């Protein structure tokens, strides 16, 4: 079993101001600080030949392409994880949509777990860049 824990953050910007779609067009800076609240991701290989994904919904599918959750689907594709015998669970200390960067924490934690499953060693800056790219792709599919 793989477990990741990613901190939530308080930012004096927020609302996507830390994403390339915003900062490439507008100048400025962002001040943020991690807090002691977290997003947890667990990955567990199972004996069931299906992909089980638990977040605010439950998905049971045969292939990655069948996943409804755009960030999970695109992260799995990006890392090259397609195993049908996998269970992914997401939990958080605070609900999403609170302005505490939960989508970024979720995405980085998920990518870290998927890379660990593949035994990939990824530099934190590369992980952050990949998470940013995945969030952009995920938002385009919503």
Write out the residue ranges for each language-model feature:
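ATP-binding N-lobe of GHMP and related small-molecule kinases
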Residues: 1-100, 112-122, 133
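Phosphate-binding site recognition
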Residues: 103
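Active-site signature of alpha/beta-hydrolase-fold catalytic machinery across serine-
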Residues: 109
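FAD-binding glycine-rich core of flavoenzymes that anchor FAD
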Residues: 123-127
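Intrinsically disordered, low-complexity acidic/Ser/Thr-rich segments used as protein-protein interaction/activation
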Residues: 128-135
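Conserved small/polar residues in nucleotide/adenosyl-binding loops
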Residues: 140-142
């Amino acid at each position: 079993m793989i477990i990741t824990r990613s901190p939530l953050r308080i930012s004096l910007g927020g609302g996507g101001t830390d994403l390339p779609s915003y900062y490439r067009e507008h100048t400025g800076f962002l001040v943020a600080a991690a807090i002691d609240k977290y997003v947890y991701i667990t990955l567990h290989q199972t004996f069931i030949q299906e992909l089980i994904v638990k977040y605010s919904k439950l998905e049971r599918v045969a292939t990655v392409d069948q996943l409804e959750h755009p960030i999970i689907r695109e992260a799995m594709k990006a890392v090259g994880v397609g195993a049908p015998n996998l269970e992914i669970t997401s939990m958080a200390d605070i609900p999403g949509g609170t302005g505490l960067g939960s989508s970024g924490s979720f995405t980085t934690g998920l990518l870290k777990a998927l890379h660990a499953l593949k035994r990939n060693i990824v530099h934190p800056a590369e992980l952050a860049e990949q998470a940013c790219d995945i969030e952009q792709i995920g938002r385009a599919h919503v």
